[in-house]
Amino acid sequence: MSTSDDIHNTTATGKCPFHQGGHDQSAGGGTTTRDWWPNQLRVDLLNQHSNRSNPLGEDFDYRKEFSKLDYYGLKKDLKALLTESQPWWPADWGSYAGLFIRMAWHGAGTYRSIDGRGGAGRGQQRFAPLNSWPDNVSLDKARRLLWPIKQKYGQKISWADLFILAGNVALESSGFRTFGFGAGREDVWEPDLDVNWGDEKAWLTHRHPEALAKAPLGATEMGLIYVNPEGPDHSGEPLSAAAAIRATFGNMGMNDEETVALIAGGHTLGKTHGAGPTSNVGPDPEAAPIEEQGLGWASTYGSGVGADAITSGLEVVWTQTPTQWSNYFFENLFKYEWVQTRSPAGAIQFEAVDAPEIIPDPFDPSKKRKPTMLVTDLTLRFDPEFEKISRRFLNDPQAFNEAFARAWFKLTHRDMGPKSRYIGPEVPKEDLIWQDPLPQPIYNPTEQDIIDLKFAIADSGLSVSELVSVAWASASTFRGGDKRGGANGARLALMPQRDWDVNAAAVRALPVLEKIQKESGKASLADIIVLAGVVGVEKAASAAGLSIHVPFAPGRVDARQDQTDIEMFELLEPIADGFRNYRARLDVSTTESLLIDKAQQLTLTAPEMTALVGGMRVLGANFDGSKNGVFTDRVGVLSNDFFVNLLDMRYEWKATDESKELFEGRDRETGEVKYTASRADLVFGSNSVLRAVAEVYASSDAHEKFVKDFVAAWVKVMNLDRFDLL
């Protein structure tokens, strides 16, 4: 570290002092703007996963590449890999099946149904923080074992698909019949920045299960996938873990039966590793020295691998046949009496005190041990509801196999969206309710049909605001994380969306559009709702003096109520939608942060978000018809007035109350209130990044550009769930 004496001495010798010290001179080094302003709005979340980070280029077509894959040759290679034990990470009982199942499970298990983020769909286990989570110790070895296969098949199989397929093959090679496999997960090339993993600053900080219901978190401790296997906060109490298990699995959309099946099925094969104290384990992959080449957790205990391996610190083998599928998990769970003990690493676990030594040692065939289980395994015996399910599975192994097959498929495909996104020869034919199924198309409107429908909509008496609002309400439920929601299916007309507060005004247009749909018989209601938005935007642009054609692609269908899981669709109800100036709760985040959250779910860039908000305001599309943010005297005209007036220094803004959610814009000279605004409006003048974009649209030469940008962003949102157009 340089001192003043160092600088004096180097100056005296003629050497540049700034090349002598220990200061970080690399790009991005030093104190950052986020260090100075930690609450800075995360506009950068809208710039993730651009083509600039993609080495494959924007023309790469994964579905096309996958079609060239020797799928069954790949599965054959994966099966062979399972028993090709490597000396740098020897396989337990000569099989990597348990390791690969855990890799797939922990990749998929980050999914949270409350916001649709997380999951295995983008291969995020390769990147921080997941590649270095405490619950993912040793999965770096699993991924490295797969590298020769990934190298062989190249871009015909993504890492994201390979992780899940490896888990499937591991189960199948162990004698289990899986439900199927759908490929289609495309890799990204940098960590997701939008996933909220929690506020804790230390790994394995405990969370109360009740807190999980108020936030989109999927684990009871920072750095875990689900729950602490030693019980809540290392309590060692099986019964007390029930609430935590239900909360975490419930946040993934799993019911009690699926939860029991997943825990038992996941613990039928393989083992945990706790040969010695975890203090022997070195830094995780992100913190490991460069020569470790992306591997982490190097152990100094014995050989550090094989019989000396330390992963969780628990040393548990559940079944007598840890490389072959069986019902031994339930048989052992109920047959024996379990006594709390500790692993060689000191972790709390249970041992079957009255059982003979029937469990094979993973590396020494001459040794046997007693069955062992995790604290949370015993929850399946001692919680009354879990016990009922577990005993049924004990007495009906086929029911267990079926339940696990379906739950595993759901676990590993939950974030992929509708079945139409699946590719490959093993996609199950059955439609499942959690896939948000849609019927087959029955309409095929011609160009003339569309023209006729547009005339009917234009003559319906619905205003521009009503037309735009109903289309936005239908399409804006889309979530980029799990590909749920969107306009296809016209679920705006079904429960629960029809009764959401945010849609109260928008759905008033539905009876008119439903009448047009029935009278024409030429298109689905879903298409007509989107077409209503087309008519509204074109009318608004025309009123602004511009002749604009808004692209429209028919082909949407109408879902039935029985194809709609009301409980799961309730999760799509927005806490806030800044595009409509809607906010339901004030106890979560700031309004402007929630606007960014919504825009990110809609896969929008900062300019796209800016154009849409500015356009929605002048079109009068606020959810409640309020004038907040409507900085124009010509509502329904697609002008750039929102930006012009927002940036006009004639007005000063003051909060209307202590909540600082609503503001009045007063004329600086007269004091007259000219406009009212929300935080979702004023952020475009306050935040430096968004203001830079707003200044473009407020310029005297920007009106036509603004309209074209608005239309492009609008069409993007309307088509977010049109996977058939890809």
Swiss-Prot record:
Positions of region (Disordered): 1-33
Cofactors (names): heme b
A Pfam family reported for this protein in Swiss-Prot or TrEMBL: peroxidase
Keyword annotations: Heme, Hydrogen peroxide, Iron, Metal-binding, Oxidoreductase, Peroxidase
Domain of life, per lineage: Bacteria
GO CC annotations on file: cytosol
Record Gene3D superfamilies: 1.10.520.10, Peroxidase, domain 2
Any one GO MF annotation of this record: heme binding
Catalysed transformations (reactions): H2O2 + AH2 = A + 2 H2O; 2 H2O2 = O2 + 2 H2O
Active-site residues per Swiss-Prot or TrEMBL entry: 106
Cofactor: binding details: Binds 1 heme b (iron(II)-protoporphyrin IX) group per dimer.
Transition state stabilizer (site feature) positions: 102
GO BP, one annotated term: cellular response to hydrogen peroxide
Position(s), cross-link Tryptophyl-tyrosyl-methioninium (Trp-Tyr) (with M-252): 105-226
Subunit structure: Homodimer or homotetramer.
Protein name: Catalase-peroxidase
Species assigned in the record: Escherichia coli (strain UTI89 / UPEC)
Organismal lineage: Bacteria, Pseudomonadati, Pseudomonadota, Gammaproteobacteria, Enterobacterales
